[in-house]
Amino acid sequence: MTESEKKQQKPQKAKAEKFKALSAPKGVPDYVPPTSAEFKAVKDAFTSAAHAAGYEHVELPIFEETSLFARGVGESTDVVSKEMYTFADRGGRSVTLRPEGTAGVMRAVIEHNLDRGQLPVKLVYNGPFFRYERPQAGRYRQLQQVGVEAIGVDDPALDAEVIALAHRCFSSIGLNGFRLELTSLGDWDDRPAYRQKLQDFLATLPLDEETQRRAQLNPLRVLDDKRPEMQEMLAEAPLMLDHLSDSSREHFETVTGLLDDLGVGYTINPRMVRGLDYYTKTCFEFVHDGLGAQSGIGGGGRYDGLMAQLGGQDLSGIGFGLGVDRALLALEAEEKRASTGRRVDVYGVALGAEAKRRMVGIVDDLRERGVSADMSYGNRGLKGAMKGADRAGALYALVLGDKELAEGTVTVKDLGAHEQHEVDLAAVVELLAEKTADRTAHA
């Protein structure tokens, strides 16, 4: 056998196949530590403020029948006509990833007869929503929102409550540089005369074909056109605020008066038109100039008639959606961070195999007592393990090695006071449960 043949007989080492690293789809953000803690803190702050105002949590599907949004949001809107993720499921049904929250909440209220009980029905929800938009700073294809809906009562005091609640949500995370813009879109009886005047005005403008189509379907949608050249042409357009009925005007004046009483500042923006067709009467938006062109951080309004349009009772409602992603960007623009608190109360450092076995039990007992606890894994030394305690933001570190095991003790380090004490191993769980409870109570 030749040398060449011998080489060929030798088993060849299999080459490890190199896979291309995957990334998230375009326009879909990841939230990983430490940003994920800030994301959760903002979402929790918004939700807690709503719970404190009597709103109950509701959990809804990520996708719905497409017809829900076509009927509820409006077929002439950009959301329905251009931005929805719509597909046929395996049964041939057209379904859509939810682009907004109100229509789904209303569907659930009708389906589960929540409107047959105590009114108003006050609900809060949170989670991801989906719109196929051109990704840019502050505008994602998967956006995160917290929203509330108050359904069943046509009362301007409820409008004021909802707006003040949204204002409180942003204040609760330390945001300062936001503004509230407010208007009234009138009721359905106010619309026909105004619609005709607006269409007459639009007919005098050199509109492109798509905008002409929109002007015929729903002329208010034209006012939502953000192109600078369109905004210039629309400068002299008739205003809905000038065409309100007496009852709609009284409703709006009551809302603004209540906001004045509550100390909630606002600017009346008569040209505001939100991108959803169901809004009536009170309509509002919170903006932050630190976000540039995508300045909206949340908004909402009243939607009288939506429930009937979706097959339910003819009950009114009002709500808002606040952007968690946008709020984080607004905090960043103010050079602030959402307050996240510490990850754990106690961090265990075990030096040696037997110490690790004992530390696993101590950490589990602490968790059983309601104390948040973690420990060092792998074979890091004391210095490396203590870095883990610092990164976790722990109040206390427990150090357990051969010396402590032999003496039946454990070293408890108070990381805030920079003090340490030897504590009986059998008593350490009880001691730390008491200490962390006291620290939490006085935080």
UniProtKB/Swiss-Prot annotation:
Cytoplasm as UniProt keyword: yes
Gene Ontology cellular component list: cytoplasm
CDD domains (UniProt xref): HisRS-like_core, HisRS_anticodon
Gene3D superfamilies named in the record: Anticodon-binding domain (3.40.50.800), Bira Bifunctional Protein, Domain 2 (3.30.930.10)
UniProt-recorded Gene Ontology molecular function terms: ATP binding; histidine-tRNA ligase activity
Ranges for region Disordered: 1-21
Keywords: Aminoacyl-tRNA synthetase, ATP-binding, Cytoplasm, Ligase, Nucleotide-binding, Protein biosynthesis
Catalytic activity reported: tRNA(His) + L-histidine + ATP = L-histidyl-tRNA(His) + AMP + diphosphate + H(+)
Compartments, as annotated in UniProt: Cytoplasm
Classification via InterPro entries: aa-tRNA-synth_II, aa-tRNA-synth_II/BPL/LPL, Anticodon-bd, Anticodon-bd_dom_sf, His-tRNA-ligase, HisRS-like_core, HisRS/HisZ, HisRS_anticodon
Enzyme superclass (EC): ligase
Bias (Basic and acidic residues) ranges: 1-20
Segments passing through the bilayer: none
Self-association state and partner proteins as the record states: Homodimer.
PANTHER family: HISTIDINE--TRNA LIGASE, MITOCHONDRIAL-RELATED, HISTIDYL-TRNA SYNTHETASE
Family listed: Belongs to the class-II aminoacyl-tRNA synthetase family.
The protein, known as: Histidine--tRNA ligase
Gene name, Swiss-Prot/TrEMBL: hisS
